[in-house]
């Protein structure tokens, strides 16, 4: 009887996510960032003025992971946090230093993307990305 769990979408998606994250983390390690943190910085750049909850929803982070990484980025001077004048929550914004780091890392991120495309093939990369985007909406 074949191992039914080897066909488990959860198991395989987690294994793939960890492998891809390790690959991207390797590119970013010399800069003291992780792929998760770079993704978060990119989200802050795109969603200027958004609350932590909005960022979590947009980027697929759970609040604990998001808060932990925001705190680290804030300690590095890449992010500042404020509280809105009205209502609850926390607003995180990218600093000039954080924005400059993104600009510095974009060529490296593009290289990581290109390396993955070359390893998978452009078609497989594009198909994988489309499937992942669909799965994120399940």
Set out the residue ranges of the language-model regions.
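Residue-level recognition of specific faces of alpha-helices
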Residues: 12, 37-43, 51-54, 69-75, ...
